[in-house]
């Protein structure tokens, strides 16, 4: 039976109603600071924490509840005769319910221009200590950290005069989930202040649920989408859905791929993605022309794909997009007329991501879960260093070819390995993704390009192990190649390029993607 409840909350949602209901059941309310004032102002009788401890709050409120009369009252096992004897001897009363949520550390660090001292002041000490104590003694103490649990607990109390052990256990689990999340945010924030690139000895990650999904990558797989706290700049988690059905697992994965590619480009660009691989990418002087070129790059694969643009979608562009079926259109904004046109199709998802071109922050991790472990690396934010570009052939690329080579490298960087991208006039004309050997990827890209490969350039995400890709490129009329270099047979590829009059540039930077 609950006789005394300790309440101290930062999020005061529903707390007055909760306390009033508890008091109507004969429960004494103990409280601290601002919570005590809120409850008192609402006409609820409150016992101040200092009246329980016999010790005043001090150090600007830093020390309020860190006292044996609080923690012994929470931690005492009621069925343990020795525990109860000691409480009586020390004149300590039990505390049967603890309702606490912690200082708003997350909200503080997400504010603009927050400084370290303000963040530090919002690290809760007493709160985590009390809720962990209550959760440890869950068989005797009800602990609530989430206002959404108030109603269910009250319903049980009204119905049975008590709270079931099953409910207490569930609430205790939520405490450790809550404190783990809280401490991980603190550790992450402090690590970011140090600014070191070294990987920590232990890696704690915390994410918040965004939505349950109908299914995962396939219908027989369950799935949920979580977001990383504070990492929403230019990310899919920050996108605002303006129209259409709920995003699926595959939608989010593909949309993320499109966003990552579009970040590589400064001039008006449109990216079309299918199964996380680019199928059409083009840059132009305006977004309409960029879309037309991206569509014409591969009008078959774009069907049912994802489109991302780095400029506002206008009516003219929307009219063209509406001629085919696409799953998603992502852009920094849409004109009112464009929205009117695109929303004629009820199933198309329209996502607004205002800062779509924002670069991924330095220090961002790229992670891949494997059974029993986690692979972690720095995010691949680099493309190439212009100072490291090395022309290795007799023929040098023209300025136009060089611009197309860099364009193609931006695309192939985001193509599953082994990957090849062909481009001409800042438009992909063929992409060969995800092959187990490079020459097959090359042949696929050339097949997509058809007659357009004449005068095009080729980008490879890794070095050529043999000269066979150069042979295939020469036969297709390709005039320039960009690749990392680094093969023990580089000279064979260089000799082949010289034989066919192809310019070749080494970047010294590989871009595998798995």
Swiss-Prot record:
<keyword id="KW-0658">Purine biosynthesis</keyword>
<dbReference type="InterPro" id="IPR002695">
    <property type="entry name" value="PurH-like"/>
</dbReference>
<protein>
    <recommendedName>
        <fullName>Bifunctional purine biosynthesis protein PurH</fullName>
        <ecNumber>2.1.2.3</ecNumber>
        <ecNumber>3.5.4.10</ecNumber>
    </recommendedName>
</protein>
<comment type="similarity">
    <text>Belongs to the PurH family.</text>
</comment>
<dbReference type="InterPro" id="IPR036914">
    <property type="entry name" value="MGS-like_dom_sf"/>
</dbReference>
<feature type="domain" description="MGS-like">
    <location>
        <begin position="1"/>
        <end position="145"/>
    </location>
</feature>
<dbReference type="InterPro" id="IPR024051">
    <property type="entry name" value="AICAR_Tfase_dup_dom_sf"/>
</dbReference>
<dbReference type="GO" id="GO:0006189">
    <property type="term" value="P:'de novo' IMP biosynthetic process"/>
</dbReference>
<keyword id="KW-0808">Transferase</keyword>
<dbReference type="GO" id="GO:0003937">
    <property type="term" value="F:IMP cyclohydrolase activity"/>
</dbReference>
<comment type="pathway">
    <text>Purine metabolism; IMP biosynthesis via de novo pathway; IMP from 5-formamido-1-(5-phospho-D-ribosyl)imidazole-4-carboxamide: step 1/1.</text>
</comment>
<comment type="pathway">
    <text>Purine metabolism; IMP biosynthesis via de novo pathway; 5-formamido-1-(5-phospho-D-ribosyl)imidazole-4-carboxamide from 5-amino-1-(5-phospho-D-ribosyl)imidazole-4-carboxamide (10-formyl THF route): step 1/1.</text>
</comment>
<dbReference type="Pfam" id="PF02142">
    <property type="entry name" value="MGS"/>
</dbReference>
<keyword id="KW-0378">Hydrolase</keyword>
<dbReference type="InterPro" id="IPR011607">
    <property type="entry name" value="MGS-like_dom"/>
</dbReference>
<dbReference type="GO" id="GO:0004643">
    <property type="term" value="F:phosphoribosylaminoimidazolecarboxamide formyltransferase activity"/>
</dbReference>
<dbReference type="InterPro" id="IPR016193">
    <property type="entry name" value="Cytidine_deaminase-like"/>
</dbReference>
<dbReference type="Pfam" id="PF01808">
    <property type="entry name" value="AICARFT_IMPCHas"/>
</dbReference>
<keyword id="KW-0511">Multifunctional enzyme</keyword>
<dbReference type="GO" id="GO:0005829">
    <property type="term" value="C:cytosol"/>
</dbReference>
